[in-house]
UniProtKB/Swiss-Prot annotation:
GO annotation (BP), single: protein transport
NCBIfam families according to UniProt: yajC
Assigned protein family: Belongs to the YajC family.
GO CC field: plasma membrane
Tree of life domain: Bacteria
Subcellular location as annotated: Cell inner membrane
Source species of the chain: Buchnera aphidicola subsp. Schizaphis graminum (strain Sg)
Name of the protein this chain belongs to: Sec translocon accessory complex subunit YajC
């Protein structure tokens, strides 16, 4: 009767060894999925936003994160932008708060 128990223990050890490989495979698979579904798209967005920040020049029409639309009047060295909202209102904002660049003439059409 004891020989059945030895065979059963040997089978359990082999099964655990096979499960550890499948566990490692699953873990690597999930890491790859997270990388390509979450991290990679965010890196692309950050790169596009950085390119937008570097391309801002006086005269560009932009939209901010708070929804303000305005024309860039001046870009400072320390990362701030003087944004002209209308003929009488100008505000200083950080470059990072600019979401997108608008086509020329957008402000006049509103």
């Amino acid at each position: 009767m004891s020989f059945f128990i030895k065979d059963a223990n040997a089978a359990v050890n082999q099964a655990l060894e096979g499960n550890s490989y499948s566990l490692i495979f699953m873990l690597v698979t999930f890491i790859l999925i997270f990388y390509f579904m979450l991290f990679r798209p965010q890196q692309k967005k950050d790169k596009e936003h950085k390119n937008l920040m570097n391309s801002i020049a006086p005269g560009d029409e932009v939209m901010t994160t708070s929804g303000f639309l305005g024309r860039v009047k001046k870009v400072t060295e320390n990362g701030y932008v003087l944004l002209q909202l209308n003929n009488t209102t100008e505000i200083f904002i950080k470059k990072d708060f600019i979401v997108s660049s608008l086509p020329k003439g957008t402000l006049e059409s509103l």
